[in-house]
């Protein structure tokens, strides 16, 4: 009998992935989460202000998001990259990216709260 499918992750962050990337160093985890939260806001604002640079900025955000386990952000950034490249669906892809970043930042803020 085949195994049941894995349940989807409800959190916008894969904390197991983050722990593997930081070798379980919780202080480092907090540092990279804080840096990502700040970087994500700056990059999304830059994408809005500099539409010609949106593809490159989305690529940068995608890599950072994958590094910390924010896979929904990474997927949304990849979709925006594709939309920029093809010229189709850019407004929708940008809106989805902003939403994914908002969700990831909320999760990060909850983790970093003292």
Q: What do the PLM-derived regions correspond to, one by one?
A:
Residues 1-10:
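Intrinsically disordered or compositionally simple regulatory linkers and C-terminal tails
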Residues 3, 112-114:
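C-terminal end-of-chain micro-motif
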Residues 13-60, 67, 90-112:
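Long, amphipathic alpha-helical coiled-coil segments characteristic
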Residues 82-92:
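C-terminal end-helix/capping segment
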């Amino acid at each position: 009998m085949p195994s049941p499918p894995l349940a989807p992750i409800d959190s916008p962050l894969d904390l197991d992935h983050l722990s593997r990337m930081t070798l379980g160093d919780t202080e480092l985890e907090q540092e990279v989460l804080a840096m990502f939260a700040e970087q994500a806001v700056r990059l999304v604002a830059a994408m809005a202000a500099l539409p010609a640079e949106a593809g490159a900025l989305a690529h940068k955000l995608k890599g950072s998001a994958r590094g910390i386990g924010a896979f929904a952000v990474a997927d949304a950034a990849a979709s925006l990259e594709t939309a920029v490249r093809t010229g189709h669906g850019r407004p929708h892809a940008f809106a989805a990216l902003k939403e994914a970043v908002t969700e990831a930042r909320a999760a990060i803020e909850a983790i970093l709260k003292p």
